[in-house]
Amino acid sequence: MMQLEVILPLIAYLLVVFGLSVYAMRKRTTGTFLNEYFLGSRSMGGVVLAMTLTATYISASSFIGGPGAAYKYGLGWVLLAMIQLPAVWLSLGILGKKFAILARRYNAVTLNDMLFARYQSRLLVWLASLSLLVAFIGAMTVQFIGGARLLETAAGIPYETGLIIFGVSIALYTAFGGFRASVLNDTMQGMVMLIGTIVLLVGIVHAAGGLSHAVETLEAIDPKLVSPQGADNILSPTFMTSFWVLVCFGVIGLPHTAVRCISYKDSKAVHRGIIIGTIVVAILMFGMHLAGALGRAVIPDLTVPDLVIPTLMVKVLPPFAAGIFLAAPMAAIMSTINAQLLQSSATIIKDLYLNLRPEQVENERRLKRMSAVITLVLGALLLLAAWRPPEMIIWLNLLAFGGLEAVFLWPLVLGLYWERANAAGALSGMIVGGVLYAVLATFKIQYLGFHPIVPSLLLSLLAFVVGNRFGQPVPQPAMISSDK
């Protein structure tokens, strides 16, 4: 059953998104094509930086998967979600300044540019590019599934139709607007998410008959829902440590977060970004997860936990308002996909194609065409991948997240802070981290009860230090030639 009152605000929202992308295309006159298309000519201020980092970091799993888990495991999961609070501070604090200064010095546009300038190894860049593409395709498929599920539940649009509407609109606006469109949309989407979260939470508390009544109802359903350990006693110390490493500390190693650290304007922007970003993450994480947990008092018998937020929207808000705030999780999903789509197309063009054919760097018309075409083709592949979705998407997302962290975290952090780090060390760290994570995650091996990310990062660090012994010191990093 398609609901027009819900669909109309959504159409209006998509039009705003396209409007911002057209504006971004018009602005695209300054600087060279690569710098502008993939980095917005490094011109982000504090508020925009905070919003784009937050919107990129907060994805379908925070708006759909996370509240779904809170619905299933109770208030303990809300507490667990707050572990993510320092994520913005960690990524901007540890990478931020140093990363941006070096990126400007090397004239780097992508993360792999930074890795090449630092370690000067082609093999390392190829390995990094391939692992990035594989993991991103996994992560973006999750976002596509999330978007289509949302339209299916809240607006009554069939899953396949929703998937097509969703996929086509994202691929188009990312392909033509580039990084500037992505960042402008993130800022607008961050605002929508904030307002949407607060209104929805108020609506749920009201529908449950007040906060204390909601908690009593949860206790009646299952006393474990209001205990710190959560239902099924899932929140053990090892689980919480693993979760913190995966979604907070490890975020430093996520390529689409790291590239946001290259593209801001000045150090005032970073300081402001850290403060605003942390506040926004706090409100969104607490609000959405609490909404999911308390939602069980309003709708106790959902079979697919991932559907909790869209179902609640339709239940506790009037249809028109539901349409407006359906835009909030849509925003979360879109902002994450466009960051990852851009990163993937940047990887294919800059790190693979221009490495093989460096003479093409001056051919801006061809690069423009290729960027758009590659983004659209990736969009089409993702549509195919998302056609038959699994039941709970949070695990699929965490799988892709962990793979990226296992490969990129140490080469990035040690490359910035350890002068003697060399290519042999970075390569051994990447290979050990990536392979170990893939094996542990595929066969669901949890050593001492830890998530695969914990042993993978520890052994990857060890492999880095040992491998470093056998490598040559890296010569002084060079400027990347001809605005590559």
Language-model features: where?
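Membrane-embedded helix-loop-helix hairpins and adjacent transmembrane boundary segments
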Residues: 1-484
